[in-house]
Amino acid sequence: MGSLSPWHWVVLVVVVVLLFGAKKLPDAARSLGKSMRIFKSELREMQTENQAQASALETPMQNPTVVQSQRVVPPWSTEQDHTEARPA
């Protein structure tokens, strides 16, 4: 029980041929193969993208730039007159 004997495979093949017909089987196999090739190429492409992203994240910065902090004076500083706009 549980394993398929050669007779099971023969019956399965006969049922598939009867269901799909002998003319449609080559087309079905061809489209299945084409779909598998597309799927594999997409997987390969995703893996190369992930590897490129991982290598970009792993490379340390060669020459980090030191930035000095600067004081930013807001336009409404206390040195200017404070006027409030009043609605007309």
Swiss-Prot record:
Residue ranges with Basic and acidic residues bias: 79-88
BP terms from Gene Ontology: protein transport by the Tat complex
InterPro entries hit by this protein: TatA/B/E, TatA/E
GO molecular function term, any single one: protein transmembrane transporter activity
Annotated Gene3D superfamilies: 1.20.5.3310
GO cellular component: TAT protein transport complex
Comp. bias regions, Polar residues: 49-71
Short name of one Pfam family: TatA_B_E
Membrane-topology annotation of the record: Single-pass membrane protein
Alphabetically ordered keywords of this record: Cell membrane, Membrane, Protein transport, Translocation, Transmembrane, Transmembrane helix, Transport
Broad class of where this protein is predominantly found: membrane
Compartments it resides in: Cell membrane
Annotated transmembrane regions: 1-21
Region described as Disordered: 49-88
Function statement: Part of the twin-arginine translocation (Tat) system that transports large folded proteins containing a characteristic twin-arginine motif in their signal peptide across membranes. TatA could form the protein-conducting channel of the Tat system.
Assembly with partners or alone: The Tat system comprises two distinct complexes: a TatABC complex, containing multiple copies of TatA, TatB and TatC subunits, and a separate TatA complex, containing only TatA subunits. Substrates initially bind to the TatABC complex, which probably triggers association of the separate TatA complex to form the active translocon.
Family (UniProt): Belongs to the TatA/E family.
Protein name, as recorded: Sec-independent protein translocase protein TatA
